[in-house]
Amino acid sequence: MRPEPGQVLHFSEDPAITRFVPHVAATTQYTEPYVWAVDAARAPAYWFPRQCPRAMAWVGPTTTAADRDRIIGAGCGDRVHAIEYDWLCALQTVKLFAYRLPETPFRPLGEPVPHAMVATEPVEPLGPPEPVGDLLRCHAAAGIQLRLLDDLWPFWDEVIASTLEFSGIRLRNL
């Protein structure tokens, strides 16, 4: 599930949102109210239950072959997402929806590389929310390795010390 050209996505477990209103997210460092969304490149980071802690790593322009092989695995693609085993059932049973939003009111947020798209005005979806479906299949179809671990922290420590690009979401929930 990725946005079409001219769109961004907002993922939610709530299928009844008719209007997105800017707010200060409880988990953000930013104090300005925003409507939050993601572009096509960041969409896979949200193919999870909302509260699920996840560590994600992918090959970037400065990634060494040694780090890629050590963390992602030789011949295992360019990207890996990892969660703890305790979250597998939720990943398999969550009903996740994607809202398609017009790209125009949104701007990239984050330095040096944007990690989200934000709008400072209310935004109405372009249509009804779409069920994302089987999140394991989403990962497989995108060629993203999904790794299950007993403890996410050792993996995360290796990722952030490597030359891979990375993102960690909801890690405070561990």
Where in this protein do the model-derived segments appear?
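ADP-ribose/NAD+-binding catalytic cleft of ART/PARP-like enzymes
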Residues: 1-32, 49-50
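A broad, low-specificity signal marking well-ordered, structured residues that form hydrophobic/aromatic
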Residues: 7-9, 35-36, 96-99
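Short, flexible loop/turn elements at secondary-structure junctions
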Residues: 13-15, 37, 103
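Adenosine ribonucleotide-centric catalytic and binding domains
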Residues: 30-35, 54-56
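Extended hydrophobic/Leu-rich segments
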Residues: 33, 37, 68-71
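Conserved NAD+-utilizing ADP-ribose enzyme module
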Residues: 48-174
